[in-house]
């Protein structure tokens, strides 16, 4: 009889789960510790036990999806990993199927994820996920940002996570199918970004706000992994970005079809989603405002 079991994790399993994380993601101790100290919850982690040991895991981080102007409960599949000696046995597929059942039982309407590589899109498609999210990648020179921010000087601003989340909701809630997070998720995204040498850059004036998460991606290149701003707040944010993270070029991730740097950049599928009941993918991708993922923690 097989001793293989799928179950929710329990407190006290962190050491074994951390070992899997570090082996599978070739991760250093500090970022690994940060996840398990700040984002891990056993009720959000499914494990596959084989022969008395944890062979694989998936984390189902609480999230939401925009639908008809409302936030609908969902989960984000994160940290999906199988130890090398247990791969190609179907353990991860079993966990993904189970995650759908567990999510539906707790009220989640969607499951979504960001494949670690292009080759994995086909793999996840086999478990019902579709490439719904789109991100526009725009590269902007420091010189262009200086022109945009002409007349603005750096103004030190630190928005609260509540302010950031409110702005994010205002910009994305009407973009059906987009991923929404809570303040806890924003705090985690900020913290893990800083552990990789990144920064949170903010702007605020007369009640209008903007923010960006950024990090250096190579010599002279700053990767802006999320930028939330209206056109009128972009100049002030650009001034603060130039000061906080000097670089020659800035590669910015933006929602597809948005007003910032309109018509520029390359639009790519960046994430997948699976409905757990109700709405179909086809309805969510109607219109010009393609669903946006963001805060992928990649």
Which residues are covered by each model-predicted region?
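Active-site rim helix/loop that mediates acceptor-substrate recognition in acyltransferases
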Residues: 14, 19-67, 176-202
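Conserved beta-strand in the GNAT
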Residues: 47, 53-64, 74-81, 112, ...
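Conserved acetyl-CoA pyrophosphate-binding loop and the N-cap/start of the following alpha-helix
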Residues: 86-98, 232-241
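Conserved GNAT acetyl-CoA-binding A-motif
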Residues: 96, 103-116, 246-256
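Active-site/acyl-donor-binding loops of N-acyltransferases
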Residues: 125-148, 215, 223-232, 239-298
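Amide-forming acyltransferase catalytic core, primarily the GNAT-like/NAT-type
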Residues: 130-232
């Amino acid at each position: 009889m097989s001793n293989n079991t799928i179950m929710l994790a329990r407190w006290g399993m962190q050491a074994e789960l951390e070992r899997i994380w570090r082996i599978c993601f070739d991760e250093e101790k500090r970022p690994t510790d940060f996840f398990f100290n700040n984002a891990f919850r056993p009720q959000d982690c499914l494990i596959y036990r084989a022969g008395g040991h944890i062979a694989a895991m998936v984390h189902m981080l609480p999230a939401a999806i925009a639908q008809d102007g409302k936030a609908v409960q969902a989960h984000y599949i994160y940290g999906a990993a199988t130890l090398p000696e247990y791969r190609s046995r179907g353990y991860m597929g079993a966990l993904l199927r189970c995650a759908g059942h567990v999510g539906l039982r707790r009220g989640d309407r969607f499951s979504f994820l960001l494949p670690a590589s292009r080759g994995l899109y086909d793999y996840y498609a086999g478990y019902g996920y579709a490439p719904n999210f789109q991100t526009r990648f725009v590269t902007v020179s420091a010189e262009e940002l200086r022109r945009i921010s002409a007349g603005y000087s750096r103004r030190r601003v630190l928005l609260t996570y509540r302010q950031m989340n409110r702005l994010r909701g205002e910009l994305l809630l009407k973009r059906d199918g987009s991923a929404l997070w809570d303040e806890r998720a924003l705090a985690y995204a900020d913290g893990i970004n800083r552990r990789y040498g990144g920064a949170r850059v903010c702007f605020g004036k007369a009640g209008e706000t903007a923010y960006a998460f950024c990090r250096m991606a190579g010599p002279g290149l700053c990767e802006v992994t999320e930028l939330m701003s209206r056109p009128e707040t972009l100049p002030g944010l650009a001034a603060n970005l130039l000061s906080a993270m000097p670089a020659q070029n800035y590669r910015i991730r933006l929602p597809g079809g948005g007003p910032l740097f309109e018509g520029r950049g390359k639009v790519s599928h960046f994430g997948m989603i699976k409905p757990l009941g109700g709405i179909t993918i086809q309805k969510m991708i109607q219109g010009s405002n393609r669903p946006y993922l963001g805060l992928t923690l990649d």
